[in-house]
Amino acid sequence: MSVPFDPASYDRQLEEKTVRLRELLAPFDAPEPQVFDSPREHYRLRAEFRLWREDQKRYYAMFAPGDNRTPILLEGLPIASERINALMPVLRERWEASPTLNHKLFQVDFLTTLAGDAMITLCYHRPLDAEWQAAAAQLAAELDVSLIGRSKGQKLVIGHDYVTEKLDVAGRTFSYRQPEGAFTQPNGTVNGKMLNWAFDALGERQDDLLELYCGNGNFTLPLATRVRKVLATEISKTSVNAALSNLDDNGVDNVTLVRLSAEELTEALNEVRPFRRLHGVDLKSYDFGSVFVDPPRAGMDPDTCELTRRFERILYISCNPETLAANIAQLHDTHRVERCALFDQFPYTHHMESGVLLVRR
């Protein structure tokens, strides 16, 4: 659910979210949350637009939730990054001037980074040929972007099919490949604040870390520098490949990444059944003191929640405070909330990202 874009009301909206998080965590005697705000505009590093034909021209369009018939035609998008806003009119001029680029184009996706990288995906209702590829290569060079063409069963890449982000955590710069189509945190500035909070909350440890839902290694890279070893899990092949590249690019060599779901890892640790994907991984060699979880909106399922109970410290990043509270309720008899934080990843919406550190009583 969104609220109107109104930078003048930002502080009030953030306070309302803070009150909501405070209320949800009150039954667990949580401390006052640290609050990490967002830039008021130009904070969103990715944007997806449908194209809407009107007066023989195509316009960038978005739709209100539940209404795919009434387009909102856009010249720019104030919540999107400055790079996206700079690219939008120039790209539109180029496709209007090129029948090859324009023909049956129906969607445009932008992905940018704080480091200045940019990628554009053009989606078509037709096969893409050599003529399109030549026009796209010229366009990519003019705009200084990577460009991807997509149609049914087809993906053509000009440049790279990823962007590179650079984020500073506790004085060290980490480089991240962010693949086209894979999940990335949309608000880069707030993501950097999340990484630094998690790094500080975990602390310097002499034991090992288990990470569930590691994605492209967003948290894995900095947290790995705080512990002896990391065992990280992820099920998306695209994210696993990106995480492996990111570990290599950053010289992080104390992480073992396995493609298992949280539920499968629970079975493996409980010795319910063996997994071929764990071949060569000696689970008994790990001395886990902490677990880091960043689950989907549904939160942790009950079995995974019980798995985390066996760890002294549970570091939890949540995109849904209601399921976070439900998971804490399940763990409250053995773990207390030592730290909590609100990260305003999604200004002008009711969505909030939050973090808690749970420590065994």
UniProtKB/Swiss-Prot annotation:
Keywords recorded for this protein, A-Z: Methyltransferase, S-adenosyl-L-methionine, Transferase, tRNA processing
Protein EC: 2.1.1.-, 2.1.1.35
Binding residue positions for S-adenosyl-L-methionine: Q185, Y213, N218, E234, D294
CDD domains: AdoMet_MTases
Catalytic activity: uridine(54) in tRNA + S-adenosyl-L-methionine = 5-methyluridine(54) in tRNA + S-adenosyl-L-homocysteine + H(+); uridine(341) in tmRNA + S-adenosyl-L-methionine = 5-methyluridine(341) in tmRNA + S-adenosyl-L-homocysteine + H(+)
Any one GO MF annotation of this record: tRNA binding
A Gene Ontology term for the protein's cellular component: cytosol
InterPro entries: MeTrfase_TrmA_AS (IPR030390), MeTrfase_TrmA_CS (IPR030391), SAM-dependent_MTases_sf (IPR029063), TrmA_MeTrfase (IPR011869), U5_MeTrfase_fam (IPR010280)
Catalytic site: C319 (nucleophile), E353 (proton acceptor)
Single GO BP term: tRNA methylation
Protein family according to the UniProt entry: Belongs to the class I-like SAM-binding methyltransferase superfamily. RNA M5U methyltransferase family. TrmA subfamily.
NCBIfam families reported in the protein's UniProt record: trmA_only
Xref: HAMAP family: RNA_methyltr_TrmA
Function: Dual-specificity methyltransferase that catalyzes the formation of 5-methyluridine at position 54 (m5U54) in all tRNAs, and that of position 341 (m5U341) in tmRNA (transfer-mRNA).
Protein name: tRNA/tmRNA (uracil-C(5))-methyltransferase
